[in-house]
């Protein structure tokens, strides 16, 4: 059941051709999704929107100078500055092209720390201490029987992120897309199913 998002958008930063703001909203009561909202500067009317789930490197993934220089050498990257943080650069570029873009955090990454990275991505054991007949936690038999998992919660977060974008006054909800690479590509496939 979809509940109110109670979204908060704050902390605007202006850059050449776009703005960026931090955002958080509730995908389920008490559980927050975090990310960065990019908008084209001085755009008018309803705009297309793109949800950008990052991969396993996280939205704050940075490449070493050697990697960036190698990518420039082979033509995979053009600019040293944008090559350092490719996920943020992709979102900024899409905004400069006229799209509203949400680069949201997977569970355990960047600002999304209600469930730790270790629990969400490195923990794979049953947790009998998290289980009784009336309540349970992730990785318990009760949760598994109800198909409650990190992947399920992350997919729901993606669905709610699309709801968030669709509800923005400057977004045309009929022109929305999802694109991501690596783990973000997996999320793209799941959201498209």
Question: Residue ranges of each PLM-predicted region?
Answer:
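Alpha/beta-hydrolase fold nucleophile elbow
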Residues: 170-182
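Short helix/loop capping segments that flank catalytic or ligand/cofactor-binding pockets
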Residues: 33-34, 61, 112, 188
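Short alpha-helical segments and helix-capping/turn motifs at coil-helix boundaries
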Residues: 20-22, 32-37, 78-81, 85-90, ...
């Amino acid at each position: 059941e979809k509940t109110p998002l109670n979204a908060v958008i704050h902390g605007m930063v202006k850059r050449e051709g776009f703005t960026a703001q931090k955002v958080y909203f509730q995908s389920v009561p008490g559980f927050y999704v975090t990310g960065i909202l990019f908008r084209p500067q001085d755009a008018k009317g309803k705009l297309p929107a793109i949800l950008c789930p990052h991969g396993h490197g996280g939205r704050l993934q940075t490449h070493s100078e050697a990697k960036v220089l190698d990518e420039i050498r082979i033509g995979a990257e053009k600019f040293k500055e944008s090559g350092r943080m490719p996920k943020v650069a992709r979102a900024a570029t899409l905004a400069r092209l006229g799209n509203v873009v949400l680069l949201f955090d997977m569970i355990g990454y960047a600002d999304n720390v209600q469930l730790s990275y270790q629990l969400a991505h490195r923990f794979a054991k049953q947790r009998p201490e998290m289980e009784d007949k009336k309540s349970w936690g992730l990785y318990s038999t009760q949760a598994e029987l109800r198909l409650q998992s990190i992947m399920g919660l992350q997919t729901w977060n993606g669905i709610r992120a699309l709801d968030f974008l669709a509800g923005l006054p400057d977004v045309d909800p009929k022109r929305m897309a999802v694109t991501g690479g690596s783990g973000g590509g997996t999320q793209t496939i799941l959201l498209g199913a």
